[in-house]
UniProtKB/Swiss-Prot annotation:
Superkingdom: Eukaryota
Gene it is expressed from: Mif
Name of one Pfam family that matches: MIF
Enzyme Commission designation: 5.3.2.1, 5.3.3.12
Record's keyword annotation contains Endoplasmic reticulum: no
Designated name of the protein: Macrophage migration inhibitory factor
Length: 115
């Protein structure tokens, strides 16, 4: 159930076609979880600053049942910062990503939970 959320001040018009699909496929590969369970939410046009400037930036979160931890998070950070840099032109030093290891009983889907 990985869910990746990107809040950014990058304009909607600058988000390339296929970016969400690319994030989905890359996260499926990185987490080892099926793409059918991965949700991606990109929220452009946000009023945001980072280091006191309005240059492109992003505040992100990755939620997952398992597959969250030290070495894994470093790999995700490298992957996701790379994609945000390549596709949205956001410098990696202007991105924060928070990681959340979710309890399966606390994640609802399809009328039930993952527990």
């Amino acid at each position: 159930m990985p869910m990746f959320i990107v809040n950014t001040n990058v304009p909607r018009a600058s988000v390339p076609e296929g970016f969400l699909s690319e994030l989905t496929q890359q996260l499926a590969q990185a987490t080892g979880k099926p793409a059918q369970y991965i949700a991606v939410h990109v929220v452009p046009d946000q009023l945001m600053t980072f280091s006191g400037t309005n240059d492109p930036c992003a505040l992100c979160s990755l939620h997952s049942i398992g597959k969250i931890g030290g070495a894994q998070n470093r790999n995700y950070s490298k992957l996701l910062c790379g994609l945000l840099s390549d596709r949205l032109h956001i410098s990696p030093d202007r991105v924060y990503i928070n990681y959340y290891d979710m309890n399966a009983a606390n994640v609802g889907w399809n009328g039930s939970t993952f527990a």
